[in-house]
A protein has these predicted regions:
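Catalytic toxin/effector domains delivered as secreted proteins or via bacterial secretion systems
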Residues: 2-191
Length: 191
């Protein structure tokens, strides 16, 4: 069993032994984002995320079209699909408002990234561009998401309190991962 820090990717995984050491002795690999508590790690070695994709309900999150030029940010690698709106005048949304499972330490701060939308992003534009790309893996991924009724336009809503964090920030769940949106030239990473 491995604890995957982000979307079961191959980088950032932590071995059974390391999870065991953390759960029993509080020891965690130095350069890896550290969960706030061993209690947030399930028996399967994965983070136990809140229900409803971490949205504070009511109200339910609403589907939107991300407009060209909109700025976004996130902590973590590009394999995730959750971002926050970034507004120059307000600056970075405070970490505790994001209800993330990891400690706000140097390893986590190194994962912070910002992005800009290069064109409007919604369910239709993503599906159209994926079909045009001829990328069989992405085409199959969209088919599977549709079958599970999990393919949607970006959803925006308030973040629920979780992981001993206050929440109350705003999050957006993208239709596919940041990495996939970058591959399709929907968004780019910015300084």
């Amino acid at each position: 069993m491995l604890l995957y820090l982000e979307n079961e990717n191959k980088k950032g995984k932590v071995s059974d032994k390391e999870v065991h050491l953390y759960k029993h002795n509080g020891i965690w690999p130095k350069d890896t984002p550290k969960p706030r508590s061993p209690d947030y790690i399930g028996e399967n070695g994965k983070i136990k995320y809140p229900d409803d994709d971490g949205y504070k309900i009511p109200p339910k999150p609403r589907e939107i079209t991300l407009k060209k030029g909109m700025k976004l940010d996130r902590y973590g690698d590009n394999l995730g699909s959750f971002v926050c709106p970034f507004k120059e005048k307000k600056g970075v949304m405070p970490y505790e408002k994001r209800s993330l499972p990891y400690e706000n330490n140097e390893a986590m701060q190194k994962t912070y990234k910002r992005y800009e939308a290069l064109e409007d992003i919604n369910m239709e534009s993503v599906e159209r561009k994926i079909k045009m790309s001829g990328n069989d893996k992405l085409i199959e991924k969209i088919k599977e998401l549709k079958e599970k009724n999990k393919f949607h336009s970006p959803k925006i809503g308030k973040i629920s309190p979780h992981f001993d964090q206050e929440g109350k920030g705003t999050q957006i769940k993208l239709p596919i991962s940041v990495e996939n949106l970058m591959q399709l030239d929907f968004i780019k990473q910015i300084p």
